[in-house]
C-alpha cells in the first residue's frame, strides 16, 4: 500500500491545531480517543500547507530518496529532469553548471531542464486560447489545483486544460529521445508531483519524483559539493522563456502575448485562499468572469513546499528572472526552433479522475441529534 503523501508523526504532535486551521480543504481532524491530528489521504490535495505550518515538524511527506538511489544503482542510464525553479533554490551554488555536474556525480547519465517542456506547454496553451470557442479553461500545471477540482469541484473536470503539467510533457520528450524504457526522475519544488505521476502510465510517467529537500539530502549523503566537480551544461534540448515558469505569470510570457488587463483572456491566481475563491467564481459566475484561469496553490512554483531554502518571493523572483535572461542570451534560436518543431507533436493527453470528497450537510434530524449529545 502506498504511503500517504502527508502523514503525522504522532509522538511529535502537540495538538496545536495549526495544521487544522490552515488546511484549505479540511482534510485534517482529530479522531475520537486520540491526541494527535490525522490527515485524510482521500481528502488531501497535496498542497503542503500543513507541512510548512506545523511548528514541531510532526507532519512529514512521503520520501522517495531510497527509490531514486535504487534506480541510480540498478540502471546505467538514468535521466534527471530539473524543474526551472532550481534558479531560485540553489543560489548557494556558484554556477548552474556546477549544479549540473553534481547531478552527474550523483549518478545521472543525462541532465535536462524542464524549461524546454514548458516552452512546448506554453505553445499548446497559446493554441488552446487562440482557438477559443466560448469554453473557458483552468490550467493544469499545478497538481494540487487539479486535485482540488477533482475532489471538491468535480463538475469542472471538463474545464481542466487538456494539457498536462510540464513534468509529464518533459517525461514524454525524454522517452522520445532516449526510448520507452529510459528511466526518468523529476526534481522539483512540488511534493504533489509524487502523487501526480501515479495517475499516468507508459511513456508519460516518470519513474520517480523528488523534491529539492530530498536532492540536498542525496548530495549530503554522497558528500557531493561544487568544489569536487567541474563545469557541465544541461543536455539538449534547451528551453527559452520556459525558464520563467517558477513565477506564476511566467508561462504567460509565451502563451499570451497580450499583456493588457483590459483584453488579456487569462487571469493568474496564486495562493490557496485566492485559488479557492477564483474557482468558486468560475463555477458560479463564469459569464461575469469571462477569463481562463492560470492557477497555482503556491505563490508560484518557486515557493513550492519542496524547497529547502527560505528565500522570500521577491528574491526568488529576482533570481529566476536573472537566470532566464542569462539562458536566453546564449540560446541558439535556430536549434531551438528545430527542436520545438520536432517535439511539439508528441501526444500527451492529460489524465483526470472525478473523486468527490465533499461532505454532505447534515439534515434537520441529524442536527437535532447532535445538539442533544
Each language-model region and where it sits:
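Iron-sulfur cluster-binding cysteine motifs and their immediate structural context
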Residues: 2-10, 14-40, 45, 49-65, ...
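Iron-sulfur-associated redox domains of electron-transfer enzymes in respiratory
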Residues: 62-373
Amino acid at each position: 500500500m502506498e504511503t500517504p503523501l502527508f502523514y503525522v508523526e504522532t509522538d511529535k504532535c502537540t495538538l496545536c491545531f495549526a495544521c487544522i486551521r490552515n488546511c484549505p480543504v479540511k482534510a485534517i481532524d482529530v479522531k475520537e480517543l486520540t491526541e494527535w491530528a490525522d490527515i485524510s489521504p482521500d481528502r488531501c490535495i497535496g498542497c503542503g500547507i500543513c507541512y510548512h505550518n506545523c511548528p514541531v515538524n510532526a507532519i512529514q511527506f512521503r520520501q522517495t530518496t531510497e527509490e531514486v538511489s535504487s534506480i541510480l544503482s540498478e540502471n546505467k542510464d538514468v535521466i534527471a529532469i530539473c524543474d526551472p525553479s532550481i534558479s531560485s533554490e540553489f543560489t548557494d551554488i556558484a554556477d548552474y553548471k556546477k549544479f549540473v555536474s553534481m547531478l552527474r556525480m550523483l549518478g545521472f547519465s543525462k541532465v535536462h531542464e524542464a524549461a524546454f517542456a514548458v516552452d512546448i506547454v506554453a505553445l499548446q496553451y497559446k493554441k488552446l486560447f487562440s482557438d477559443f470557442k466560448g469554453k473557458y479553461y483552468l490550467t493544469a500545471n499545478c497538481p494540487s489545483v487539479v486535485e482540488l477540482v477533482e475532489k471538491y469541484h468535480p463538475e469542472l473536470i471538463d474545464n481542466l486544460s487538456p494539457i498536462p503539467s510540464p513534468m509529464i510533457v518533459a517525461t514524454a520528450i525524454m522517452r522520445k529521445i532516449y526510448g520507452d524504457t529510459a528511466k526518468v526522475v523529476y526534481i522539483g519544488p512540488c511534493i504533489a508531483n509524487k502523487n501526480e505521476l501515479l495517475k499516468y502510465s507508459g511513456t508519460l510517467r516518470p519513474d520517480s519524483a523528488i523534491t529539492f529537500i530530498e536532492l540536498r539530502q542525496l548530495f549530503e549523503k554522497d558528500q557531493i559539493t561544487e568544489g569536487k566537480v567541474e563545469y557541465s551544461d544541461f543536455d539538449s534540448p534547451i528551453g527559452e522563456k520556459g525558464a520563467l515558469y517558477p513565477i506564476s505569470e511566467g508561462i504567460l510570457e509565451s502563451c499570451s502575448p497580450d499583456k493588457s488587463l483590459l483584453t488579456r483572456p487569462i487571469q493568474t491566481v496564486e495562493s490557496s485562499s485566492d485559488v479557492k475563491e477564483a474557482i468558486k467564481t468560475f463555477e458560479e459566475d463564469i459569464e461575469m468572469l469571462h477569463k481562463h484561469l492560470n492557477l497555482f496553490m503556491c505563490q508560484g512554483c518557486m515557493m513550492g513546499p519542496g524547497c529547502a531554502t527560505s528565500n522570500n518571493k521577491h528574491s526568488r523572483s529576482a533570481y529566476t528572472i536573472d537566470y532566464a535572461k542569462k539562458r536566453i542570451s546564449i540560446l541558439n534560436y535556430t536549434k531551438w526552433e528545430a527542436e520545438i518543431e520536432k517535439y511539439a507533436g508528441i501526444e500527451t493527453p492529460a489524465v483526470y479522475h472525478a473523486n468527490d470528497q465533499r461532505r454532505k450537510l447534515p439534515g434537520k434530524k441529524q442536527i437535532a441529534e447532535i445538539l442533544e449529545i
